[in-house]
């Protein structure tokens, strides 16, 4: 290891060596979630207070005990990614500055057919834990009704992840369709509590059943991943009978070490619960085509971009989240008469996928502000361009956009 005594989490005083020892202790569970899968390396080389960068390609000088798999991407590029198969591989990943593990939903032996369907229950601002749990229970029932078993874990942030082992018979498009059908059925059974709407400003104070984590090239923080929060929180597998009574903040490196030592991994049986997508794909046929864009949406501005049906204004585009929150505070200070009308869900701070790191977009939905009092779209308080110089012609407007990251997904 390099710099084993470097403090990674100042609040609990955890060093780089502490993180390696943690992953060695929970290796059985961590490898059950991430082992044998190509993974994106999310490297916090400047600490948890700085933005990480995402490295798809495995370092050339990787040790012999790190396998690799070459993935093909939508733009015609490819990347040889790391495949961890043992505890030594986990230690190597941490030594690179990775905190959480971000594997693809495929095995290295078959890169075209996922063996795991993933659902991220992502709460909008203003949603409490009990509502997230209510939606999780509905999702569990929908899965069971269609012959599948959902395995819950905390996301390590505010939400819940449901993992579903499936037969590797379907391609990414079919798996995503099955997940989308699950999300739509959850929304139908829990109206007002859950949303399958893709456009964030239309979800209100609901739990977004994020099916798009099943798109190709997406990854999700896997079980026992340490998340970049000050308390060293862990994405922790749960039994269904403890989902309602536990809270994400209870699960940190220290408490999960004790929990794992006492009871082992609640997901120990996940690989024995492999199911078929036939039921969810039949549900997709019954539900019919999903709504491609909200009613009234238009692309008639000549840009090819979707025009929201909501009265949105954009506040800023920034390189880091602290800069985004600072811009939001400045906008609120300049518009004090608007702030009392805003609900938590009206303030949209989105992490956006750049080429190798996240950038942030700040928008405000003025739907609850009286029309006469709505401010006009003005100049952005910050206008960071993550694509500048990376595409022919300069800015990213000519080269494509990365899209937003909901919950804990990584592109």
Question: Predicted regions span which residues?
Answer:
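C-terminal accessory nucleic-acid interaction domains of nucleic acid-metabolism proteins
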Residues: 1-14, 20, 28-31, 35-36, ...
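Charge-rich, low-complexity segments
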Residues: 1-90, 94, 299
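Short beta-strand
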Residues: 41-44, 150-156, 197-201
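Signature for HUH/AEP ssDNA processing cores
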Residues: 82-155, 166-174
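A short linear hydrophobic-aromatic micro-motif
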Residues: 147-153, 194, 343-348
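A short beta-strand motif that forms the metal-chelation/ATP-contact edge
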Residues: 161-167, 207-211, 358-364
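Acidic/polar low-complexity segments and flexible, solvent-exposed patches
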Residues: 297-411
């Amino acid at each position: 290891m390099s710099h084993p005594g470097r403090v990674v989490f100042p609040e609990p005083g955890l060093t780089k060596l502490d993180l390696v020892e943690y992953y060695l202790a929970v290796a059985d569970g961590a490898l059950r979630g991430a082992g044998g899968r190509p993974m994106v390396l999310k490297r916090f080389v400047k600490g948890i207070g700085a933005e990480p960068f995402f490295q798809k390609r495995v370092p050339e000088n990787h040790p012999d005990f790190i396998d690799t798999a070459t993935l093909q991407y939508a733009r015609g590029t490819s990347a040889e990614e790391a495949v961890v198969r043992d505890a030594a591989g986990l230690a190597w990943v941490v030594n690179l500055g990775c905190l959480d593990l971000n594997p693809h939903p495929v095995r290295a032996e078959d890169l075209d057919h996922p063996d795991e369907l993933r659902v991220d229950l992502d709460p909008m601002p203003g949603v409490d834990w009990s509502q997230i749990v209510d939606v999780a229970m509905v999702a569990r029932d929908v899965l069971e009704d269609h012959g599948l078993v959902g395995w819950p874990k905390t996301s390590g942030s505010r939400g819940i992840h449901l993992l579903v082992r499936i037969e590797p018979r379907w391609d990414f498009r079919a798996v995503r369709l099955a997940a989308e059908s699950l999300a739509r059925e959850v929304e139908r059974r829990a109206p007002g509590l859950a949303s399958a709407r893709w456009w964030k400003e239309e979800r209100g104070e609901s739990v977004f059943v994020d099916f798009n984590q099943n798109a190709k090239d997406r990854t999700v923080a896997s079980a026992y991943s340490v998340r970049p929060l000050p308390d060293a929180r862990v994405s922790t597998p749960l039994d269904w009978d403890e989902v309602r009574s536990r809270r994400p903040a209870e699960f940190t490196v220290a408490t999960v070490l004790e929990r794992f030592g006492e009871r082992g991994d609640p997901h120990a049986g996940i690989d024995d619960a492999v199911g078929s997508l036939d039921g969810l794909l039949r549900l997709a046929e019954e539900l019919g085509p999903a709504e491609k864009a909200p009613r009234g949406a238009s692309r008639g501005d000549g840009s090819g971009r979707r025009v929201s049906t909501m009265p949105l204004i954009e506040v800023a585009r920034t390189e880091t989240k602290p800069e985004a929150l600072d811009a939001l505070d400045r906008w609120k200070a300049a518009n004090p008469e608007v702030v009392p009308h805003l609900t938590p869900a009206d303030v949209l701070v989105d992490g956006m996928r750049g080429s190798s790191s996240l950038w942030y977009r700040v928008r405000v939905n003025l739907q609850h502000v009286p029309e006469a009092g709505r401010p006009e779209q003005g100049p952005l308080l910050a206008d960071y361009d993550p694509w500048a110089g990376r595409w022919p012609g300069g800015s990213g407007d000519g080269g494509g956009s990365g899209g937003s990251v909901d919950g804990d997904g990584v592109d």
